[in-house]
Amino acid sequence: MAQRILTLILLLCSTSAFAGLFDAPGRSQFVPADQAFSFDFQQNQHDLNLSWQVKDGYYLYRKQISITPSQAEIAEVRLPAGVWHEDEFYGKSEIYRKRLNIPLIVNQAASGATLTVTYQGCADAGFCYPPETKTVPLSEVSASTVAKSTPSPVAAQTEETPQPAARLPFSALWALLIGIGIAFTPCVLPMYPLISGIVLGGKQRLSTGRALLLTFIYVQGMALTYTALGLVVAAAGLQFQAALQHPYVLIGLALVFTLLALSMFGLFTLQLPSSLQTRLTLMSNRQQGGSPGGVFVMGAIAGLICSPCTTAPLSAILLYIAQSGNMWLGGGTLYLYALGMGLPLILITVFGNRLLPKSGPWMEHVKTAFGFVILALPVFLLERVIGDEWGLRLWSLLGVAFFGWAFITSLHARRSGMRIVQIILLAAALVSVRPLQDWAFGATTAQTQAHLNFKPITTVDALNQALAEAKGKPIMLDLYADWCVACKEFEKYTFSDPQVQQTLGDTVLLQANVTANNAQDVALLRHLNVLGLPTILFFDAQGHEHPNARVTGFMDATTFSAHLRDRQP
């Protein structure tokens, strides 16, 4: 009896094994969207909780979640912070794994009110789902008791999402380095001996400990001003984040930072009005140097006097803080920025002017280099408006300008070993110019032929017509969307391969762009029984699909070529 049971188990296992062995390599192993992202909601009067159970190996994009009420009014939606995910085409994005809860406050809802919830996610294996839309029916509630119930969800959300502070170390490190770099610009460095003497109250003989204490207090006073500024901007940034998505705002900010960068190049001077600077200077002069209280006030006032060299970098940091809307990030980043500016002052005060580099043209070079750093911000902002292709050309132009300037500047250096640096800078400039060269003179023949010539279709009727017009040739239908990372990988790495192109030489190539996910896109996907993208379908000469040849998920050129050969008669 035991032997028969064992034999039966072995038969079942072998059946499963052979089924997997002969399973088509392109067959979908992905679950439907409702199983990958199980959505649910609960409403208790004014409290509404939206929840997702995310399957292992899948994730939701934070930026793709939208919540729109109909015949109802809800409090401001604050999405929890996610974890960072990075890919080649979209850079860094925040995503949610495992479980996501979004508590909401329904201020009031009429009879028949609804909430439209849209979300979109992908699988780690390289498969993305179209945006899903769910309609949440709301119970009728009045606005009478909303004031009492409003604070609880915000508090709960704050407890669940302490993660933004975790991003502080990397950002703070850059702020610290920028502060140190600003200290060596021509507007700041020559002032340090004078500031050092004022801080010490003109007393030349002070113990090292006393001098260190007074200078540190001065720097803390300066840091207090910057930290307060960071907190204010971060608080205002909570309302600023939505505005940053508007093209006109992005273009306006790009123009502002371009002007700030030009000020770093010396085209004009940007500083506080002279009357205000004079008042602040007089207030600072009334303080008594050499005393902790007076030194602290002097430092706080000094933080208000923005020199021409500090205005542009400070504005760039403030934009970053405003975009984050994070109070800890805002205060901490500017505190360390001020600390970076103060470190050289502490060293000079304690160890004397012998540590101070000699003034010279190199300080102007530092200021100009910061101008190029500031110019990166307009490119970053405009890239969201003009798209990746033109964004790459702007980055290319900025790279050529920076490396070209650095190369020309290095020609005046007389130090040994600069020849190697010059070669590296020249090579970097030549590499940076490539996208501009392709744009101005056209890509090479090989590059021009690097993409397959797809015929676009948009509807089920257009697909049926294209299948009828194939004239006895096999057909390949590629389903594409801009939000599909693996679709872009197919374009760059698979469809550009000469072997793949040669194999598809006699195949009619169709492509449906379902980025908009509108009604006709949804109808097409439903007609083809497609769960998500990338999905590639193959039809025979009679217009019938080969179901076992369907591809879901990314394939590299070698694997895809083998798949194409296997489906050939």
From Swiss-Prot:
GO BP term, pick one: cytochrome complex assembly
Domain (Thioredoxin) ranges: 430-569
Transmembrane segments: 168-188, 213-233, 248-268, 301-321, 328-348, 362-382, 391-411
Annotated S-S bridges: C122-C128, C187-C309, C484-C487
CDD domains (UniProt xref): DsbDgamma
Signal peptide start-end: 1-19
Record's catalysed reaction(s): [protein]-dithiol + NAD(+) = [protein]-disulfide + NADH + H(+); [protein]-dithiol + NADP(+) = [protein]-disulfide + NADPH + H(+)
GO molecular function: electron transfer activity; protein-disulfide reductase [NAD(P)H] activity
GO cellular component, one term: plasma membrane
Enzyme Commission number(s) from the entry: 1.8.1.8
Lipid bilayer topology: Multi-pass membrane protein
Homology family: Belongs to the thioredoxin family. DsbD subfamily.
Function as written in the Swiss-Prot or TrEMBL entry: Required to facilitate the formation of correct disulfide bonds in some periplasmic proteins and for the assembly of the periplasmic c-type cytochromes. Acts by transferring electrons from cytoplasmic thioredoxin to the periplasm. This transfer involves a cascade of disulfide bond formation and reduction steps.
Protein name, as recorded: Thiol:disulfide interchange protein DsbD
Organism from which the protein derives: Citrobacter koseri (strain ATCC BAA-895 / CDC 4225-83 / SGSC4696)
Lineage: Bacteria, Pseudomonadati, Pseudomonadota, Gammaproteobacteria, Enterobacterales
